[in-house]
């Protein structure tokens, strides 16, 4: 049960954040509410995939012999192994890049890259800490940081690119300016 505590704290934090911003979300259109609620649901899924003690193996055996630091398996060598999780991480973070563009439309690309690296590094640091504290049994991998950041930036670039097409009419109602600056 203790292994689930970090995930439960994370989910509780998301709901507290949502409640604390309810005065702002009350001003949102129905399309903006869809953006906010789907972003929260997406964050819950990412939390589950990265911080919950799951027994799901989305990839086969790792091709890398990790360093063991404490009880955490750690890979600090970039691109040593490119298993299916390499591509899964890119796909997992693309929606986050899209949500960042919808929720914080004023962010410039450099800050988007930095935000993606910070979020990815934060996930890996949490996995390392939770491996030590509660035995989460997750790999800490530099490839995850790189591929997550790439997926984050790629998702942002997709929505920016679509904003320069006729699809902009569809995207615009979902953009939130409530949380900007």
Residues of each region from the PLM?
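Non-cytosolic membrane-interface motifs at loop->transmembrane helix junctions
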Residues: 136-146
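Bulky hydrophobic segments
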Residues: 1-138, 156-181
